[in-house]
């Protein structure tokens, strides 16, 4: 079970960090399964709400012959979309060190406004904000709307993790170094920018450094869904350990 922010939390929890999830699922079999997964993993479900009127959102992932993935969603509406501003646990946010978010909670109201309230609470409390756009085109009315919401996310984060396809689409630049430079120039509060390259590894841009890391390939790999979230969780674990001022 996921989705992306929960996958990040699961990695952090396994690394010994204290984590909590904010979101909404349906009061149905899938929702109860997800709540149970949180509790089993050790992630706090204090910010998890159960909706008796709307079902839990489902994502179906199909692996294609070339190894790429195709996502299908049952979400019109889904319970995750129904989280409201009033349900945001501001005290929980204030007592945290990092707030991690994506754009799946920005596709529709009321969860879009709820996400913005959570971001504002995190900023007011002085947290490090971490953002992974995790673009899923089928969930958006238009890609232009997606671009607008991604720009909102970029304007508020200190750490950005973005995929190779996403950064090329967002900047219209195929050179990752130039694309990263363009984003950092427009959003100068971003301290650490990470580009995941799939089987090619990853790139990191920090201060004036560019770091290229080769992939950890395994011949028996079956499924890569969640690999980027595991990567993100590992990065946040290191940020919690060292801070953003001295990652060298």
What are the functions of these language-model segments?
Residues 12, 163, 228:
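Short, conserved phosphate/pyrophosphate- and ester-handling motifs at nucleotide-, phospho-/glycolipid
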Residues 4-14, 115-121:
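Histidine-anchored nucleotide/phosphate-binding helix
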Residues 120-121, 173-248:
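Conserved phosphate-binding/catalytic region of the ribokinase-like
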Residues 18-103:
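Conserved N-terminal subdomain of the carbohydrate kinase-like
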Residues 7-18, 63, 238-241:
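Alpha-helix C-terminal capping segments
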Residues 104-182, 192, 200-201:
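Conserved beta-alpha-beta core of the PfkB/ribokinase-like small-molecule kinase fold
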Residues 91-92, 152-153, 186:
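Structural alpha-helical scaffold elements that stabilize or flank donor/cofactor-binding regions
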Residues 17, 43, 127, 188:
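Short phosphate-binding/catalytic loops that engage adenosine nucleotides
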């Amino acid at each position: 079970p996921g989705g992306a922010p929960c996958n990040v939390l699961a990695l952090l929890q396994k690394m010994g960090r204290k984590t909590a999830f904010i979101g909404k699922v349906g009061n149905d079999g899938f929702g109860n399964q997800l709540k149970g997964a949180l509790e089993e993993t050790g992630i706090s479900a204090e910010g998890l709400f159960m909706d008796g009127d709307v079902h839990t959102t489902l994502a179906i992932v199909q692996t294609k012959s070339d190894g790429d993935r195709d996502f299908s969603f049952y979400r019109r509406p889904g319970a995750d979309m129904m989280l409201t501003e009033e349900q945001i646990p501001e005290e929980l946010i204030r007592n945290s060190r990092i707030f991690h978010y994506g754009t799946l909670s920005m596709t529709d109201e009321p969860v879009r406004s709820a996400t913005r309230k959570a971001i504002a609470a995190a900023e007011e409390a002085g947290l490090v904000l971490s953002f992974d756009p995790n673009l899923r085109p089928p969930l958006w009315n238009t890609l232009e709307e997606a671009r607008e919401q991604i720009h909102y996310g970029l304007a508020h984060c200190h750490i950005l993790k973005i995929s190779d396809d996403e950064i090329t689409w967002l900047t219209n630049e195929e050179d990752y170094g130039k694309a990263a430079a363009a984003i950092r120039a427009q959003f100068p509060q971003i301290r650490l920018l990470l580009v995941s390259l799939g089987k090619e590894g990853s790139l990191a841009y920090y201060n004036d450094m560019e770091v290229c890391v080769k992939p950890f390939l395994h011949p028996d790999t079956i499924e890569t869904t969640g690999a980027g979230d595991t990567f993100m969780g590992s990065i946040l674990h290191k940020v919690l350990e060292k801070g953003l001022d001295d990652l060298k």
